[in-house]
């Protein structure tokens, strides 16, 4: 029987598979206890959600109302997410019944998800399209907060920017939340510019409404020993040089590091001493899983956009307008280069990190290089 894989990614990571962040965990726990609203800002797959769950595990007698806002498109979507999160907050169905009762004006219906067996609440879409309906669902949170010690997490909060009534939605949310002074709201987001705009723009209703807690890459001195120990748990021997090579390949993004280490584990046997020779087989496994997606993503690009992407893979993203880069990318002008970059960012293929453009998925970069484009 094959041993359980010691690396986890693409999900909330808890227990032994979670690499501790003691300072951040301690800060977040103290903010939650104090009812201090917090903004968690970090790039994709840095472990923000896992950090929140680790903080929750350290809090006795606190409930967490976790609301995932990814891909919301309407006010009705937002209301449904909050109501469903409230209904699922406890093991007992009393939360679902109370959620239905407290939101009676929105004509909610209760169903059971056939896969998870968890309750799902849907409000009347016509009633919920009025941004003022958000006040009803926040009032639901307020009622629960009076009865339970809880904190609220809005994950992927930048998705609110997608709503047609964005400004009104933010204003109503802020207007209700500011009176829940004993309840901590954690706003987590992976699109840094959008989160910064919501919480630092003087014109935003959420201006200076929460403390910012940055979630950077794990320090090498913490993450490397953790990974070496996890490999040892899987009967593989990794040294610091190998781990450093993994860091360089993945831009030190927590989730991508775990994914690559998982692929290494899959392509090696017990007792293996890991070296550079194990990198290519692990990449081939990832390409087998994600190659069709990479092909689809690049097939939609124009010639200029594709050439720009390949040049970024070859030369990196710091000297975009240098003569060498422009020649490699075959860009006719700086305007054409800027236009191609804008499209690649909009498509979620790259993002700006400081003054450097990086691949959202570092394995797309290595895939492009492996193809010899």
What are these regions (language model features)?
Residues 243-249, 255-269, 307-310, 342:
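C-terminal helical "lid" of AAA+/P-loop NTPase domains
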Residues 266-289:
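Conserved C-terminal helix/linker of AAA+ ATPases
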Residues 36-37, 41-46, 50-150, 160, ...:
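P-loop NTPase nucleotide-binding core
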Residues 124-192, 200:
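Conserved Walker B catalytic segment
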Residues 76-83, 220-228, 322:
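An amphipathic alpha-helix signature
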Residues 2-5, 288, 292-373:
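C-terminal leucine-rich, beta-strand-based interaction scaffolds used for sensing/assembly
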Residues 1-38, 43, 351:
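A short, basic N-terminal segment
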